[in-house]
């Protein structure tokens, strides 16, 4: 990746905070945004935003704290234009973005023909994924279109007792 990069790596200690003489700080999620905000020197602060983190939580304190991290005065760098706009709208943080990346030598679309299949990413342990609602929808899809192959990945659903046939990936 970065053969000429020379950087120091330190584990963060909340008791001492960020110490040292740095030219800038990059936060990469909401807890690191607050840690970097506590740094006493006046240096540029960037916030590398990879997800809209408030959506990781139901409405409540964690949602608010995550959303407020976009109001700390950073310059944001986001993965894609939607996320950059969402962060600016939610917290007022100016946010540049970079385009999504893919290694097309490894990941390609190999089947462009019509298929009677549907794919669902199920992760029941992660509330924001809405697995319960998705499974209810798939049950109705199967009732209306029993010829569709339903593919489920993300979690082993083989023992979930679902009321429709599916391919467990």
Name these PLM-found stretches.
Residues 70-108:
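Donor nucleotide-sugar binding/catalytic pocket of nucleotide-sugar-dependent glycosyltransferases
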Residues 1-21, 146-149:
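N-terminal pre-catalytic "stem/leader" segment of glycosyltransferase-like enzymes
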Residues 54-60, 96-116, 161-162:
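Acidic anion/phosphate-binding donor-loop and adjacent secondary structure
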